[in-house]
């Protein structure tokens, strides 16, 4: 896009009769940017995607999109050429800003394409809001598809049923958040740390929480760290199953309620045998945290290399904690 085309596009961004002048500022790839979204028209943009579109391609400074309280029924895509975007809910809590849609695999979008929000850009941040897919049951329906490296999600609710949260690739950090679903609702190939997060199995018949597909060459997959696991019914919820044969999942120092199927918390998936995956627990507590031959426990010496910092460090020493 030429400079003149960008300028024209910015001037054309009008909300409620007021020109979105900040859209002009956003055209500079080097300038820090703050944009405001409000469903009631009191901001510069009425939709989140319109604000994302206003951020300059190949921006080098953080662009913060403040989203006022409201429900935003839309599909949001953060493309790979728009790094350093923050979506910040300005309501009193994450339930006050909801980005929601109802695409599904059954609807012809495919599992990955069903996502309400797709993040392809690096160093994306989301705070104090909700990502939801309210399709219902009976098909995969993703709330968020995480792809960009070094994604951070703080005080975020992820709502859905089957396949709520797709940690698809790269490194993802989810902290002080809430995730709910029915089947495989934390899944993907990524290296992802869930820290101090509440995870809720909402189906009365239970189901597997995680379905990791960690590449065999990757040491780290999913770390569930100091989280709280609850569910609708007792003794029905599995910690996970291996979407890929080399799946790596560690539940560490977490509170496991009676919802966990204590005698068999790991199960097979699509020909992948759970015993061949890299499934472990370490120092969990709660009535669902018993030990037996079906619950491999990580040793202290090994656990020293399976901390949140180790999971996320990569080759650049990233530490968002």
PLM feature segments, named:
Residues 32-321:
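Sequence-level preference for short, compositionally simple segments enriched
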Residues 1-31:
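Secretory targeting and sorting signals
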């Amino acid at each position: 896009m030429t400079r003149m085309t960008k300028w024209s596009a910015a001037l054309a961004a009008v909300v409620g009769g007021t020109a979105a002048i900040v859209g002009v500022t956003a055209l500079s790839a080097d300038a820090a940017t703050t944009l405001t979204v409000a469903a009631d028209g009191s901001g510069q943009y009425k939709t989140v995607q319109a604000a994302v579109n206003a951020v300059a391609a190949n921006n080098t400074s953080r662009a913060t999109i403040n989203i006022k309280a409201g429900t935003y029924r839309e599909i949001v895509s953060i493309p790979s050429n728009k790094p350093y975007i923050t979506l910040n809910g300005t309501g009193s809590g994450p339930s006050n800003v909801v980005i929601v849609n109802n695409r599904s695999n059954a609807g012809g979008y495919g599992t990955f394409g069903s996502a309400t929000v797709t993040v392809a850009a690096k160093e994306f941040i989301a705070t104090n809001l909700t990502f939801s897919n309210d399709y219902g049951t009976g098909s995969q329906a993703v709330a968020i598809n995480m792809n960009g490296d070094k994604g951070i999600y703080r005080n975020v609710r992820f709502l859905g049923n089957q396949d709520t949260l797709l940690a698809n690739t790269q490194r993802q950090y989810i902290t002080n958040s809430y995730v709910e679903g029915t089947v495989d609702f934390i899944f993907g190939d990524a290296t992802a740390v869930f820290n101090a997060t509440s995870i809720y199995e909402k189906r009365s018949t239970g189901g597997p929480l995680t379905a990791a597909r960690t590449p065999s060459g990757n040491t780290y997959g999913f770390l569930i760290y100091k989280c709280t696991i609850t569910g609708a019914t007792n003794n029905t919820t599995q910690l996970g199953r291996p979407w890929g044969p080399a799946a790596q999942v560690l539940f560490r120092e977490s509170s496991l309620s009676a919802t966990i199927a204590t005698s068999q918390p790991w199960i097979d998936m699509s020909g992948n045998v759970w015993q061949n995956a890299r499934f472990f627990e370490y120092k969990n507590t709660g009535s669902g945290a018993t030990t037996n031959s079906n619950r491999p426990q990580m040793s202290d010496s090994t656990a020293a290399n399976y901390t949140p910092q180790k999971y996320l460090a990569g080759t650049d020493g990233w530490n968002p904690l």
